[in-house]
């Protein structure tokens, strides 16, 4: 009954932690592609190939349902995977869906015409690849009208977080927020469009100010997954053991993950 969680590095651990807190009896298999992180600077074909390889590894662990806990993979690869590659008995879900649902206050299956929503000015902070894909703007346009989205590619933030350099990460966040505010001085909401960013959410909130509502993905994704599994229990795979896998050096990744989440995590080689 295991569910797979895939990310290019360690950011997806924020999503896994939220899922585990909400569904403590659900076995989860995490795969971090630390050998190839970060994805945010790669081209779409490269991201597609790496993501498919990661998802196939999780299928081998008995995970028929895999969460792409990586916005770059969700933006650059998911649609193509679902249309051209995915077997009928498997599911791959991205992390954009719950965020769009929360922002537009409508369920993903609601295919009614786009309508006005309360929030009119949205700041999007994401990796360069996610911003370049325009996937967030595209999905939002299907569901809402009259929403102005200003996107800021946040180069360097993921690298700083993966290195454990909180001071550098927070300084970069401040710089990126200031750059966006020069173009959109008064956003009403901010989307943290990378699963690494919840670890520096306080820095985003401080730089944006208390008047801006910051949407962060882990809890939204966990809530959405619980709802999905309630409607599709057949998608629980045969796996029954929680594991942490990495394409990188397990010892090094374990140390960084432990620092990342502030509790011990032991990774194995994928």
From Swiss-Prot:
Tell me the PROSITE patterns matching this sequence.
Answer: ASP_GLU_RACEMASE_1
Top class in the EC scheme: isomerase
Q: Note whether Cell wall biogenesis/degradation occurs among the keywords.
A: yes
**Record-annotated residues binding substrate?**
7-8, 39-40, 71-72, 195-196
As recorded in UniProt, its EC number(s) are: 5.1.1.3
This molecule's function is given as: Provides the (R)-glutamate required for cell wall biosynthesis.
The text of the family note is: Belongs to the aspartate/glutamate racemases family.
Protein name per its UniProtKB record: Glutamate racemase
Tell me what organism the protein belongs to.
Paracoccus denitrificans (strain Pd 1222)
